[in-house]
Amino acid sequence: MTEEQVLNTHNAEILLSAANKSHYPQDDLPEVALAGRSNVGKSSFINTLLGRKNLARTSGKPGKTQLLNFYNIDDKLRFVDVPGYGYARVSKKERAKWGKMIEEYLVTRDNLRVVVSLVDLRHEPTQDDIQMYEFLKYYEIPVIVVATKADKIPRGKWNKHESIIKKKLNFDKNDHFIVFSSVTRDGYDEAWDTILAEL
């Protein structure tokens, strides 16, 4: 069964932005959180999966997402875009505030079914990437690691880069790892199939 048969992915809209749990939607729709460092390609990932060009705003300015952005998908599912981490030009105080907001959502939100943790296929995971993965494993939150920007690397080198990332993350072989490109749409079907299997 494809995602199109399960839900109309094009029927999507940004629902609300929230700073804390009092602002979260009050229902039982399943949620998929998307986490990753600034400019890893989260907005492009969302837009590609939902078949929309500008639903999630892509920005040349890292650290632009400062709230939890909830996207309603066909009234059956929500994506939750969490603030990009690891951006140096944000104050320590602001980063700490974001960290608390993200942690509160990830640890306390009953609607959360899985976290899509995005990393850049071209580079080794940063310390922030590693800490995010360790955090999710510690709290036993289901995680899918998606390595973005695959189109920037020759296809023949994908396996090598995947191995490097998995080693640095101390990757759990029971988790899913998907190589993805918003340009070529590589990984599109696998991403949807894996997400839907977690709901």
UniProtKB/Swiss-Prot annotation:
Gene3D superfamilies: P-loop containing nucleotide triphosphate hydrolases (3.40.50.300). This is Probable GTP-binding protein EngB. Necessary for normal cell division and for the maintenance of normal septation. Keywords: Cell cycle, Cell division, GTP-binding, Magnesium, Metal-binding, Nucleotide-binding, Septation. PANTHER family: ENGB-TYPE G DOMAIN-CONTAINING PROTEIN, MSS1/TRME-RELATED GTP-BINDING PROTEIN. The lineage of its organism: Bacteria, Bacillati, Bacillota, Bacilli, Lactobacillales. The gene is engB. It comes from Streptococcus thermophilus (strain ATCC BAA-250 / LMG 18311). Mg(2+) binds at S43, T65. The keyword DNA damage does not apply. NCBIfam families: GTPase_YsxC, small_GTP. Its cofactor is Mg(2+). GO terms for biological process: division septum assembly.
